Amino acid sequence: MIVGMEGIVERRDPTFIHLNVNGIIYEIQVSINTSNAIQEKRVKLFITQVIREDADLLFGFMDTNEKKMFDTVLKINGVGPKVGLAICSTFTPETFAKVVASKDVSMLKRVPGIGPKAASRILVELADFIVDGNAAEGSSGALGEAVMALESLGFKKDAIQKALSGCSGDTSTLVKEGLKKLQRL
């Protein structure tokens, strides 16, 4: 899996770049924010690689928070790379975290390809979206980390939230409590 690339920009469009890495030129899809942030010929990008039956796609980001935002929205059922990139082009990670925290459907509907149903689903799925290790409004950092840890173990977000409701403590305590309660469910 490719997680980063450094090379010389051969061509730059608003939604993709051609990056020459040691003589091999890759087409990398980028958000408009990333495209605007590329000022130098030599650039280092954080990469998300999406492998499909018919394509091997690379998505590049200058900012790790933008990459995290993209990776997070891709996990939502019905949200593909095209919509994920549109979200990254429309919002900065900080703005997106505020939109999610305030559950602002109308702001999310501004993104091309997102209607009212999809916007509502995204807001429900991303209730605990975190930027820069700080939790979005209404969620402590330890709670957000515990939720992510339990999700990485394969538990569903709604079950995790039920299990962790009323719990407090540091991340490891919350994970232990969550595991105990999730085993009973």
Swiss-Prot record:
Region (Domain III): 139-185
Superkingdom of origin organism: Bacteria
Keywords assigned by UniProt, alphabetized: Cytoplasm, DNA damage, DNA recombination, DNA repair, DNA-binding
Region of interest (Domain I), residue spans: 1-62
InterPro entries the record matches: DNA_helicase_Holl-junc_RuvA_I (IPR013849), Hlx-hairpin-Hlx_DNA-bd_motif (IPR003583), NA-bd_OB-fold (IPR012340), RuvA (IPR000085), RuvA_2-like (IPR010994), RuvA_C (IPR011114), RuvA_C_sf (IPR036267)
CDD domains (UniProt xref): UBA_RuvA_C (cd14332)
GO biological process, one term: DNA recombination
Coiled-coil zones: none
Region (Domain II): 63-139
Region (Flexible linker): 139
Signal peptide extent: none
Single Gene Ontology MF annotation: four-way junction helicase activity
Subcellular location: Cytoplasm
GO cellular component assignments: cytoplasm; Holliday junction helicase complex; Holliday junction resolvase complex
Chain's role: The RuvA-RuvB-RuvC complex processes Holliday junction (HJ) DNA during genetic recombination and DNA repair, while the RuvA-RuvB complex plays an important role in the rescue of blocked DNA replication forks via replication fork reversal (RFR). RuvA specifically binds to HJ cruciform DNA, conferring on it an open structure. The RuvB hexamer acts as an ATP-dependent pump, pulling dsDNA into and through the RuvAB complex. HJ branch migration allows RuvC to scan DNA until it finds its consensus sequence, where it cleaves and resolves the cruciform DNA.
Oligomer and partners: Homotetramer. Forms an RuvA(8)-RuvB(12)-Holliday junction (HJ) complex. HJ DNA is sandwiched between 2 RuvA tetramers; dsDNA enters through RuvA and exits via RuvB. An RuvB hexamer assembles on each DNA strand where it exits the tetramer. Each RuvB hexamer is contacted by two RuvA subunits (via domain III) on 2 adjacent RuvB subunits; this complex drives branch migration. In the full resolvosome a probable DNA-RuvA(4)-RuvB(12)-RuvC(2) complex forms which resolves the HJ.
Comment block on domains: Has three domains with a flexible linker between the domains II and III and assumes an 'L' shape. Domain III is highly mobile and contacts RuvB.
The family this protein is said to belong to: Belongs to the RuvA family.
The name this protein goes by in its record: Holliday junction branch migration complex subunit RuvA
